[in-house]
Amino acid sequence: MGAKRVVPARELSLEEIQEIKDDTGLDMECFVHGALCYCYSGQCFMSSMLGGRSGNRGRCAGTCRLPFYLDGTKNTKNAYPLSLKDLCTIEHLPEILDHGVDSLKIEGRMKGSRYVGEVTRIYRKYVDLYLSEKPYKVESEDLKILMEVFNRGGFTGGYYKEYHGKDMMSMKRP
């Protein structure tokens, strides 16, 4: 087919991504920052059924970000049981790059220019530090900026290193 680069599903571990790269020789472009879907990548039908737009075709209606009341009341405590925290891998960049990831993908669709600019600037800074082969620690000010431009009750490292279960869920924020 002539493919040179693939974007693997966000649910894969770093070991699985490395295995695909080793087996195929293809470049890997991986999501490192942005929204995570409650469903497996490409398998969300909730957006189509409840929102009338296909999340599998880049038109997610964000139905997993709506409040759902599991106890039959409109109790707002934990009203967002399907809302995952956003992915933030800034502290795991060396491991991600060491596992053969060639290109980093930052969510920008339907985001403002401040979000895209700040997130890109911060990731660029730490990619450059990694490439300079100097050890570094992510500065608290940079983490604060990432939290301020957008988050859903904190961040998660996603599936790259381990499955985090309920720690990946926001519950209180859409």
Regions found by a protein language model. Name each.
Residues 3-174:
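Surface-exposed amphipathic alpha-helical tracts and adjacent flexible/coil segments at the periphery
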